[in-house]
Amino acid sequence: HPVNSIDVNSELKELLLSRGKWPLFTHQAEAINKLRDGNNVIVATPAASGKSLCYHVPTIDLLTEKRTNRALYLFPTKALAQDQLETFDDMADGLNIRSAIFDGDTLPEDRAQIRRYAQLIITNPDMLHLGILLNHRSWSRFFRELKLIVIDEAHVYRGVFGSHVANVIRRLRRLCRIYGSKPQFVMCSATIANPEDLSRELIGLPFEVVNQNGA
């Protein structure tokens, strides 16, 4: 069911309207409102239910509200990262948000610029570990201003790979504490039986669950 009971800035609303994405579905509005109330949120709804809007909308809000704010998106594959960068840039068209992918394909000469200027960094768990956390001193400004961390396709982080990613996230949270930030988390997953367990295993924080598909 579409729902209008949510405030987003007028420019963003116009953009969403022009792309046929407004009004939002109930599960999108629920996730965004829970996030605004200060919660960490896991959205576990079927494919093609518009989960990515649950994090693109708050990210755009956050990054237009204060230009120094930073956000981090984690995807398991480069193809997904590329898809969502294009979706984000299309949704944020004309809002002057600096977004960039930072992965193994990022040219060395671009890396310092991205580190310094990108408000939204899109990466994968391995690059987060090897390229960002291990060089955390040169990312200190990013960590200080980091407000939101998005983990999409979270259901793939199971078993050995899941344990590895959970360790990377723990390290990320520790560095955020050291640099004085306390980012919120949004996780998105396919429909799974126990989203609370997944979020606890992976992040180690309490999460609000959104799993009623309102599309």
Regions found by a protein language model. Give the residues of each.
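Conserved P-loop/Walker A NTP-binding site and adjacent catalytic elements of P-loop NTPases
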Residues: K13-Y179, P183-C188, D197-I203, F207-A215
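Canonical AAA+ ATPase core
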Residues: A193-P195
